[in-house]
């Protein structure tokens, strides 16, 4: 069983998605029974993306959005993904499943939802991807992290985190954000630190 992002394309111009496609192909070539789960954005305890959007909203006077911000995401709760993995682990069918949550957001609407829930609604401005990358690079230096890569920006803006299929998760991100509004974004969560220190919690 393997977990990969929603879009794994062998001919993608983005190395990340080509790598995921190679992984899927290698797994299929083994001949063993397998389930390939393709989650989009994850949320849950010690979340990175949702938490760090909230962190930025708590501290910055405005929030920059790459381009129009109309590209879509289907966040899935980490416990829903885990339950799906356990369920498929007990089966012997070869399947590929798009693991998505019950809600679809544009990126702009996601930021707006988080801001409203934590009481930090901020003006959103559209910025060119190149400027957004430089701004994220500078902020990343301040917090000792790589906040986003150029390929991640391209994948996000290409709508690669959206797929037209029924949701597999049942937990709504809007409900989860409301339940955790008091603590969300109080501290920055470093993905780089977690990769370096494997003892850090996820």
Q: Residue locations for each model-derived region?
A:
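Oxidoreductase cofactor-interface core, primarily capturing Rossmann-like NAD(P)-dependent enzymes
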Residues: 11-120
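Low-complexity, charge- and small-residue-enriched intrinsically disordered regions
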Residues: 61-76, 139-160
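Short, small-residue-biased leader/transition segments that mark boundaries at the very start
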Residues: 2-9
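Mid/C-terminal beta-alpha module of Rossmann-like enzyme folds, strongest
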Residues: 85-149, 159-202
